[in-house]
Amino acid sequence: MGAAASIQTTVTTINKKISEKLEQTASASATANCDINIGNIIFKKNKGCNVLVKNMCSANASAQLDAIVSAVREVYDQLTEQQKAYAPSLLTAALNIQTNVSTITQDFETYIKQKCNSDAVINNIINVQSLEVDECSAPPGQIMTFEFINTGTATGNCAMKSVLDVLTKSSDRVSGNQSTGNDFSKYLYIIGGIICFLILLYYAKKLFFMSTNDKVKVLLAKKPDVHWTTYIDTYFRSSPVLV
C-alpha cells in the first residue's frame, strides 16, 4: 500500500511539474489548438491502470522537450535515496537505458533528445496519434491513474510517451512485488492450517484409536488394587488337602 501510494504521488507530481514547465517555458495552453490529437491509448496488458489525456499544446517543440526533461529532473532530485537507487533499473527495463544513480538524469535527457529529435519523429506528420503502452498492473486492490499530456507536437509527445513508459513500468514492478508478498502470506496461512490439522488429527487418534500397549495399560488400570493378604488367604483356601 505504501509503495503504491508513493508511485501515485510521484506520477501526480511529475504531471503537475510538466504542466507548470510547459506553461512557463513553451507557452503551452490547454485552450490552444493542437496540431496533434490523441486517438487511442492501447495497453498490451492492463490490470487496474487508467490514462487521462490533458492538452497543453504549443508549436515550440524544442522548448517542450526542455520543459519535460527539466520537470523530470526536479522530481527525481526530490526522491528519497531509496527511490533514487531504484530508478536506474526502471529506465533500463522501460527504455533500455544503461545508467546509474550518478548519471541517470543526464542519461535520460540524452536519450530523450536523441530519440525525439530524430528525423523519424520530426517528419512524422499526423493529426491523430495512437499510443501503445507496454504492460501495466496496479497493486492488488488499487487503481493507478496516469496522465498523458498532449503537447501538440510529435517531439513533445515522444518525450511524454517515454515518461509514461517509465511510470507504468514502476507500477508494474510494485504490483509484482506486492503480489509476491501476498502469495507468500497465503502459503504461510496454508502451512499453518496444515500444522493445526495434523495436531488435531494426532489428538483425535489418541482419543478414538488405541494401540495394543495402550489397551493393556487400560485393562490393567481397571483391575482392583488387591492387598497382598488377600492373595495369602486365597492360597490357603485353595490349597490341596494332604491325606
UniProtKB/Swiss-Prot annotation:
Keywords: Disulfide bond, Host-virus interaction, Late protein, Lipoprotein, Membrane, Myristate, Transmembrane, Transmembrane helix, Viral attachment to host cell, Viral envelope protein, Viral penetration into host cytoplasm, Virion, Virus entry into host cell. It is found in: Virion membrane. One of its GO terms (biological process) is virion attachment to host cell. The chain crosses the membrane at residues 184-204. Induction: Expressed in the late phase of the viral replicative cycle. Myristoylated. GO terms for cellular component: membrane; viral envelope; virion membrane. Pfam families: L1R_F9L. It is a single-pass membrane protein. It comes from the Viruses. Its main location: virion. Residues 205-243 are intravirion. A lipid is attached at residue 2 (N-myristoyl glycine). Residues 2-12 are annotated as: Targeting to MV membrane. Residues 2-183 are virion surface. Disulfide bonds join 34-57, 49-136, 116-158. InterPro entries: Virion_mem_poxvirus_L1. Component of the entry fusion complex (EFC) composed of OPG053, OPG076, OPG086, OPG094, OPG095, OPG099, OPG107, OPG143, OPG104, OPG147 and OPG155. Except for OPG095 and OPG053, each of the EFC proteins is required for assembly or stability of the complex. Component of the entry fusion complex (EFC), which consists of 11 proteins. During cell infection, this complex mediates entry of the virion core into the host cytoplasm by a two-step mechanism consisting of lipid mixing of the viral and cellular membranes and subsequent pore formation. Belongs to the orthopoxvirus OPG095 family. This is Entry-fusion complex associated protein OPG095. It comes from Fowlpox virus (strain NVSL) (FPV). The lineage of its organism: Viruses, Varidnaviria, Bamfordvirae, Nucleocytoviricota, Pokkesviricetes. The gene is OPG099.
